[in-house]
Amino acid sequence: RRQRQMCIRDRDIYGVEHDVLKEDIQVIFTKSQFKMYKYYSSWEEYIAMYQNYGCTAGKCNEEESFLPDAKLNYQMLQTLTDISEDEIERLANRSVEKIQKVASDRETMLEVFGASSQYKNKNAFQECLSIYPELLSDPYTKEMLRQIKKNLVKEGKSAKLDLSAKYMFLIPDLYAFCQWLFLGDKDPCGLLKDGEVSSFLYRAYGKLDCLRSPHLYREHAVRNNVVNAETKKWFTPNAIYTSCHDLISKILQFDCDGDKSLVCADPLIIDIAERNMKDIVPLYYEMAKAGAVIVTPEEIFHGLRAAWTGGNIGVISNDITKIWNSDDVDIDAIKILCMENNFCIDYAKTLYKPTRPDHINAKLSQITGMKAPHFFIYAKGKTAHQVQKKNGSVVNRLDKIVPNK
């Protein structure tokens, strides 16, 4: 009853009262989702304009019924500098076993072809292999297997490792949102506490490592996984839900508008990440915001040109990789480059990038002038003279662990 009374008094951003139950409202947009609300006097005016000009809406992303396993990448592993040789070998174990079995074990062959039972949307060739596995002895199939094995070796040596991990949509604790919206609770408790996430898919695991690309600073968000009767009732199965009391969105730099996290349930990587994340706090700085302009062909052109000329984040992320894989990791330099990378990402929207002070530029130029790390031979197809000599960095150590044959 209390909820219904509060619903009656709820107002939209234009001050109009709504009863969510009586009006059978199925979808609620927040102010932040309605980017151009200032240009309309009411929701009804927006609807009229929408219909008058024949506007349509499209889905950019849709939750999949089946989430395939995913792999970590070198950015996520290179930041775990406090790691032993034994731990690296154990992390690489599944990938090494796959390489060793890919030419002899039928189940491994079917898996690398995408023809095993876990894959639902098979193409014609995969269906044939699934129905008649003897095709694995065909000369064409054997040649494909050789190429697959070659790629698996490259992936292993560049830290694309097989671990228990899946990409999931990031969703906030919407129960807390309902408490705020319908009950007027200015400090809602929600279903998740600080340091907690909820993933029904990984309900058998007590802790999860939540990751996101690009992973440039130390951004391993290890959280307790809470799955109970209430979360089962209110949360959908194939997503990762985060707490409204947590700074996880600042660590992973995500918005709740279709962003995904690579959620890893491997106990070993979680132990290593927890050790390396000790005393690490999120990087935070105020970002610029562009002024409003009338949308014209000229402004669209300026925006596109800015995106192409000022948004090259690949150079910066490669410079950060050089530092992580150097003999002396300069954390302060990485922090500065991470900031520059984020300004670069937003440049097409903001048309602003900070200017380096001379002393900072001198320091960074010296560091980033180095060659790429040795494992870029496998990760980026570099030649031996384009990379540094092999050192003892985390990813470079995989070179001797992952077999060539």
Language-model segments: residues:
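Duplex nucleic acid-engaging cores and interfaces of nucleic-acid transaction enzymes
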Residues: K260
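Conserved small-residue
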Residues: R1-Q5, R9-S249, I269-D271, G291-K405
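Short, conserved aromatic-histidine micro-motifs
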Residues: R275-T296
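Short active-site loop/helix that positions an aromatic residue
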Residues: K250-L252, V263-D279
